[in-house]
Curated annotation (Swiss-Prot):
Pfam families: Med18 (PF09637). It is found in: Nucleus. Component of the Mediator complex. One of its GO terms (cellular component) is core mediator complex. The keyword S-adenosyl-L-methionine does not apply. This is Mediator of RNA polymerase II transcription subunit 18.
Amino acid sequence: MDNLVDIDEDGTQEKLSVNSTPYQTQECVLYGSIFAKNVPDLERRLAGLCDPGCEEFFEHEMSFSLRSSGIMDIKTDIKLRRRFRTEHRIQNYWQLKYIGVPEPDQKCPTIVRKEISSLVHSQDMMTYAKSLGLRMDYEYMTQGKLWTKGNIKILHSILTSTSRAGTYDSNSIKSVSDSALVEISISLPESAEYMPAAKSLRDFADQLMPLVNMEKVDYWKKMFPAQAAPRR
């Protein structure tokens, strides 16, 4: 979905479809959640606010971290994502997405972070990830819909996980929650001024209330715990 090259392994497309967004960008993003039973209400709201039509997706995502040794334990987030197929073979094309540390701008109404996306082909992705020094933190599957409003992307999805690592049959996949995750974002050139886009994203998010309260989630505070004061 994000800066992906749409590659058809079955050979049914005549040419590749390439997203024109540069691979290295900055991203403004907000997160929210809604009970799964209320998703139809959200979809009706989005149908009235967004561009015509939406796109369904079913994806497998793994989150890896790369920790640097030193005085502080710095954690770098790497996301691996691929289309998830239940009836056909799983694709070996992955989106490799680096997510940078959010900007420490308390006045900005959204999360702002650097991201780098690229496409990787591998029949043994775990071996490739380990060769990069990455360690998997968790994995999950997402199934939902993508909407757009100009350059704003809106995703809502149900998250599921497998009870046995590496096994993805219907008996092993279980729902994570009775709620759906909602994410809205804007991608900008790496050096662009982000505040106008962030305010525009916040204004759009406010139109989803009271169905969804989109928030600037301080997830990085858990990623980077405060250091203990040195002993004297």
